[in-house]
Regions:
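Ubiquitin-like/PB1-type beta-grasp interaction modules and other compact soluble beta-rich domains
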Residues: 1-78
Length: 79
């Protein structure tokens, strides 16, 4: 199935500065599996924050559907 993966903040470095990519992923895959198909292992990224699907925050283990838009965000900090 086809989905769109968008990276935010410093995570765009994993897409060589691009903010989004279309990805062909297995039917019923999780957000974690979708990120792995494009070379992103969230557990290895210190500043990985959270994911959202279709603008709604979800768990990394939630399943995706055809046409979903998966966004990955870094940890947010400030001071």
């Amino acid at each position: 199935m086809k989905i769109k993966i968008l990276l935010r903040g410093s995570l765009v470095n994993f897409f060589d500065g691009e903010k989004e990519r279309e990805a062909d992923v297995p039917d019923g895959c999780t957000a974690e599996e979708a990120l792995r198909t494009v070379g992103i292992d969230w557990k290895q990224i210190k500043n990985f924050g959270f994911v959202a699907v279709n603008s709604k925050r979800v768990m990394i283990y939630d399943t995706l559907k055809e046409g979903d838009e998966l966004k990955a965000y870094p940890k947010i900090s400030g001071g």
